[in-house]
Amino acid sequence: MTTQELYNAIICKPDLHSRPTLHDDILIWHLYQNAYVQAFCHDGDTTIDIVSNSLFSGSVMHWHPNEEDMVDELYNLGKAGNMLVLKKSLLGTGIFYIGPVQNFPLADRTPLHFGKKKWDGGQLVYFEQK
C-alpha cells in the first residue's frame, strides 16, 4: 500500500471530522487544537505520528501499525467525535484510549485540548478534535 492509496481509502470513509491532505507522499490531518497526525505507508513500512504544533513542536508519539491496519487506525483517529488519549510515563508514551469522547472511561478528566492530568504513576495527555 502506498500513502496515496491510504489517502484514497480514508477520504471514502463516512463521518470524518475533516479531510486530510496529501503532501510529498505524507498524509497530514489537522484534527486537534495543538497537534496533527502524519501518516506514511510504502511497501510495508508504515508510520502514524502525532506531531505537536505548539511552541516546542515535534513528535509526541509515533507507532508502526501493520499495513492492513493503517486505514482502520487512521479512521479511528479521524472519525468525528473521537478522541485520543496518550499515557506518558518514565518508560515512554503509549496509547491509552482511542474512541468516542462520551465512552472515555475516566469521567473526571479535564476537558482541555492537549490537556494533561496526572494518573496512576504517569500523565494522560488528551487530544480532542477541534
Feature map (PLM): residue ranges:
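A short, compositionally biased
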Residues: 23, 44, 90-92
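Proline-rich intrinsically disordered, low-complexity coils
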Residues: 14, 20, 58, 65, ...
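Intrinsically disordered, low-complexity regulatory segments enriched in Ser/Thr/Pro
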Residues: 34-69, 108-130
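Acidic, proline/glycine-rich low-complexity IDRs
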Residues: 9-10, 72-130
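N-terminal "first-domain core" detector
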Residues: 1-30
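Generic recognition of long tandem-repeat/solenoid scaffolds
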Residues: 24-32, 48-50, 95-105
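Short linear motifs in intrinsically disordered
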Residues: 17-20, 36-40, 82-90
